[in-house]
Amino acid sequence: MYWKVIKFIVLIIIPLNFILGMRISNIEALKMNRYIKVENDIRLWVETYGDESDEAVLFISGAGANSTFWSERLCKALVEKGFYVVKYDHRDFGYSSKIDYEKNPFDVMQLTKDAITILYSLSINKAHVVGHSMGGFIAQLLAIHYPERVLSMISASSSTNAESVPPPPSETWEIFMENNPTNNFENDLEGFLKVWKYLNGTAEFDKELAVEYTRNLYERQEIKGAIGASHVKAQSNLNDRTEQLKKLQVPALVIHGEEDYLVDKFGGVQTAECLESSRLVLIPEMGHIPFNEQILARFEQEIIQFVEKNRRKTDSN
């Protein structure tokens, strides 16, 4: 019996662990960071995971969020399933070029063109596009203006920008205004944690997740005053996309938290109603940004399952 156990370990367990280890190492080896020039002196920080010949997934963060919003776990899970993952920092945020917005203003349509430029630079003809909050606006605009480049679309914690979407409660802006970062992580952390706890919704708040998220912001840039202010200004000329979304044929998933106090859940419901080929997922207790491991895992699993379901039958890029 003893030798049978030893034989099982030698013949099965050790080779399996070796193979799994090689697979993880290969994923790490296939991660690349680079800058992509999108306009004049503007360069965007871009991270890619996996084999560039595989079907692509483009992750688009929201205002005041860098690429770390999309976890390593999520990216690697998609690579293991045979996808090429791309995520990046928007202009004027994270590692990407900083801009004097008053001298060189931009809008969300320009941010949409940035996304297309990234795909072009990476020789990606089509991609599954996944956007959160403002990133959801960009994902929608990609599907509207560049339908030939979009395999499927996920719009999370976003809306159509219709006037019928209820505005955030006054408490939301009050909490935002109370947070006045000074580029000192230790001193500023308490203010950010208050904001993150509020945006988390009613689920149990995971402080460790929130601290890591905040630290990632400080590691990439100076954090002073209103975070992502230029991105908020960039949204000022957004129009209602209801009628444009109704014309889309792209497979779509709309994810929204039941307790989103920044973008009301009606924004997600209405977005799904506009899209002919869509599925709506409302996650109980989830707010605008999930700082709860269980809810975050659910959020990521919904993305993985949808992208897998809408994988193309051919291997052409």
What does each of the following model-derived ranges do?
Residues 125-165:
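Conserved hydrolase catalytic core segment
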Residues 173-243, 250, 270:
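Alpha/beta-hydrolase
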Residues 109-127:
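Conserved acidic catalytic loop of the alpha/beta-hydrolase fold
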Residues 261-267:
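Conserved alpha/beta-hydrolase "acid-adjacent" motif
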Residues 278-317:
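Catalytic active-site module of serine/aspartate enzymes centered on a nucleophile-bearing elbow/loop
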Residues 248, 254-256:
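Short beta-strand/loop motif that positions the catalytic acidic residue
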Residues 42-98:
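Conserved HGGG/HGGXW glycine-rich cap/lid loop of the alpha/beta-hydrolase fold
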Residues 153-183:
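Flexible "cap/lid" loop of the alpha/beta hydrolase fold
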